[in-house]
């Protein structure tokens, strides 16, 4: 879909390990696109990643990106190490890690991090950037009149006199969505009043 819909030279963001192979397909189909990939889960160390039967295909695909990002420098280094040792990517210079990433006693601290990789004539920028929230802003917005009125509209539109049960989670087989639906089914079977 991204290949068919993206404008000439657009940036396509790909998210998480479920789509490891997507950048390679996108690059083959649309070499004009800028491809960014963000890995939302820990990228394993070489000793674990090297066991995967598709390790080379995964790395070659991710190395089709213009930018590959991870939450913390350790995961960035794990990826850089895998790419250099398993498929021969060339490592760019290491740069100092932002102090917010370095805490005494933190097992995942890195003092420096690889800035980029070179592979098949391409430069792949590496990014360490935790995805976080701004609790103060969320709290402020939560109680604002506009959000409260939107909330009321949602309640009126969705409930319509019914009970509403909501679950918010990632659509990933490891998150137990099927089990959640089965549990809900059992609840409805046992509690006819719901």
Q: PLM ranges: what are they?
A:
Residues 1-194:
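Catalytic cores of carbohydrate-active enzymes across secretory and cytosolic contexts
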């Amino acid at each position: 879909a991204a290949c068919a819909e993206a404008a000439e030279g657009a940036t396509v963001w790909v998210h998480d390990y479920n789509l490891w192979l997507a950048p390679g397909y996108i690059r083959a189909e649309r070499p004009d696109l800028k491809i960014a990939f963000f890995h939302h889960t820990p990228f394993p160390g070489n000793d674990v990643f090297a066991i995967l039967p598709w390790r080379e295909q995964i790395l070659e695909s991710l190395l089709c990106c213009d930018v590959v990002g991870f939450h913390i420098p350790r995961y960035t280094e794990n990826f850089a190490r895998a790419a250099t040792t398993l498929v021969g990517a060339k490592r760019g210079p290491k740069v100092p890690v932002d102090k917010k990433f370095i805490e005494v006693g933190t097992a995942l601290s890195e003092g420096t991090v690889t800035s980029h990789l070179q592979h098949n004539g391409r430069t792949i920028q590496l990014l360490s950037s935790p995805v976080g929230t701004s609790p103060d802003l969320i709290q402020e917005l939560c109680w604002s009149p506009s959000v409260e009125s939107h909330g009321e509209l949602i309640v009126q539109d969705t409930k319509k006199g019914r009970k509403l049960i909501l679950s918010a989670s990632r659509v990933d087989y490891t998150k137990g969505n099927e089990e959640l639906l089965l549990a809900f089914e059992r609840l409805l079977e046992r509690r006819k009043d719901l």
